Regions:
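N-terminal strand-loop element at the rim of the active site
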Residues: 5-13, 17-19, 23-70, 161, ...
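Short His-centered aromatic/hydrophobic patch
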Residues: 92-98, 118
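Conserved acidic donor-binding segment of nucleotide-sugar-dependent glycosyltransferases
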Residues: 309-310, 314-321, 330-335
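A conserved, positively charged/aromatic
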Residues: 112-142, 155
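A conserved mid-protein helix/loop that constitutes part of the nucleotide-sugar donor-binding site
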Residues: 14-22, 193, 197-216, 227, ...
Length: 365
């Protein structure tokens, strides 16, 4: 079996990068011949080339009509790889790379199977192009949450769709003592209640609703709430609108992008992922739980599938600052040590890489 993974993201890639890194290394460890094609400038390409330079190919996946020349160029590059490496399966991870792979298969009449993982929560459009893409040019589809599976409209596509929840590296993400250095760096006190998110800083991640909720607390509790956000810092306009205008600049900390998020997670009392769009299941949520941090999540898409409510975390209505505020007001009565132990226990039972890798390989067979 020769598998080619594809990914269109030219930058950091977020969850796509995590997913494909785990999967690529996982199938190689089981003696399956695997390759990956991704933009040369992408984090995924650079990371995987360090240990597997001959298995990583520089390919872009343009998708706009005005990019037709570049599309043709990359289709030709893709065809050469597929023929040379005798690829049986191309595992695509987004619509741009799926389109290019489809055109390559159609134009050159190549014989390989296409597996698609759907990483977002958007409904599949119903038009002639989507019918082709997800019909003839999708042999099997993987979704990472039950929510996505329920969103699949057609019976034909649902029959060839498998739910495989994301796995994480439990040897890498495990409980550790709070980082005193990071506490000092961000001037966080032992009496503070620290919320951390490593899910990113885009507004669709919903962090602004936690900030709003905290701003409405009484002065004593409000002063103790610290909200730490790991990821690229937002624009000054976003900071002004969602933080400064409600006088929360002393409560919110942007760390900037971190390759290793464990130090940041270590200082958390509670993790949070309050997404209002795009999200499916969230690697970040599972990573924080594996490190023994209970997580506050919104009920958007598949986020709630990570949590047993009021046992290893909490579920609130998406976009509801008022529900979050009610949660914050009862936080001093919670036994966070018990919640932390439950979160870590859940991760050991359900979030490991073994099932994730093995269940994906079953789709290939």
């Amino acid at each position: 079996m020769n598998i080619l993974y594809t990914n269109f993201h030219p930058g950091n890639g977020g969850g796509h990068t995590t997913y494909l890194t785990y999967l690529f290394n996982g199938v190689l460890s089981q003696s399956i011949n695997a390759f990956i094609a991704a933009p040369e400038v992408s984090k995924l390409n650079k990371d995987l080339k360090k240990n597997n330079p001959t298995r990583v190919f520089d390919i872009d996946f343009p998708g706009k009509p005005k990019e037709v020349v570049n599309i043709i160029k990359n289709i030709r590059k893709l065809k050469k790889i597929i023929i040379k490496e005798q690829i049986n399966i191309v595992h695509v991870n987004g619509t741009p790379d799926h389109k290019v792979v489809m055109l390559c298969k159609w134009f050159y009449k190549l014989n390989f199977r296409i597996i698609r993982t759907k990483h977002d929560s958007f409904k599949i459009k119903q038009n002639w192009f989507a019918d082709k893409l997800y019909g003839k040019y999708t042999d099997q589809m993987i979704v990472v949450s039950n929510f996505q599976y329920d969103q699949v409209i057609t019976n034909d596509l649902q029959k060839k769709t498998t739910v495989i929840h994301n796995g994480i590296d439990l040897e890498y993400f495990h409980p550790r003592e709070k980082s005193e250095a990071m506490m000092r760096q961000f001037n966080i006190q032992d009496t503070d209640i620290v919320f951390v998110s490593v899910a990113g800083t885009a507004l669709h991640k919903g962090w602004q609703f936690l900030v709003e909720a905290a701003s409405n607390l009484d002065d004593e509790l409000r002063s103790r709430i610290k909200i730490v956000l790991v990821g690229n810092s937002p624009t000054n306009k976003v900071v002004e609108q969602y933080i400064n205008q409600i006088d929360m600049q002393d409560n919110v900390i942007f760390t900037g992008f971190m390759d290793d998020v464990r130090e940041a997670v270590s200082i958390a009392d509670i993790g949070f992922v309050l997404s209002i769009g795009v999200e499916t299941i969230s690697f970040a949520c599972r990573e924080m739980m594996a490190m023994g941090r209970p997580v506050l999540v919104s009920d958007y898409a598949g986020l709630s599938e990570n949590i047993d409510n009021n046992q290893d975390g909490w579920i609130v209505e998406q976009k509801s600052a008022s529900q979050i505020q009610k949660f914050l007001q009862k936080i001093k009565r919670l036994d966070l040590i018990e919640f932390s132990n439950s979160a870590n226990k859940k991760s050991k039972q359900e979030f490991g890489l073994g099932c994730f890798i093995n269940n994906t390989i079953k789709v290939y067979l």
